């Protein structure tokens, strides 16, 4: 977020780190990206997640640990956002749960937070989804307003 004028006129409202899922650790996860960490001022989480979703082409929650606030964002995306595509990821076969798509190993993805919280109903959680967007409208608007600092 830029305040004032000049190259040093920047106020950081938060940051989000996205990293590719690791097939060895997380499973194939449809070759998606996951949240690696975030620090966000109150109210800016969804905006930063929008940016991360647009820049990665598809994003999941952290595969091992998610805060309650972040879970609420993922649930909102999966149930209420008409501008996103929600893709259900499957649970790996080593969880001893029935898989949703046992013939497709490409969507197998670690479901630690969803499974820890919801057990056999893990698939109903927004934490079990991959979120995609078409295009980069939020990023484009932030760039046009010189409000996005990318590193």
Residue ranges and their predicted role:
Residues 2, 45, 50, 96, ...:
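Compositionally biased, intrinsically disordered low-complexity regions enriched in proline and serine
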Residues 16-24, 57-151:
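Terminal substrate-recognition subdomain of acyl/acetyltransferases
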Residues 35-55:
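Conserved acetyl-CoA-binding loop-helix of GNAT-fold acetyltransferases
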Residues 1-39:
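A conserved beta-strand-loop-helix scaffold within acyl/acetyltransferase catalytic domains
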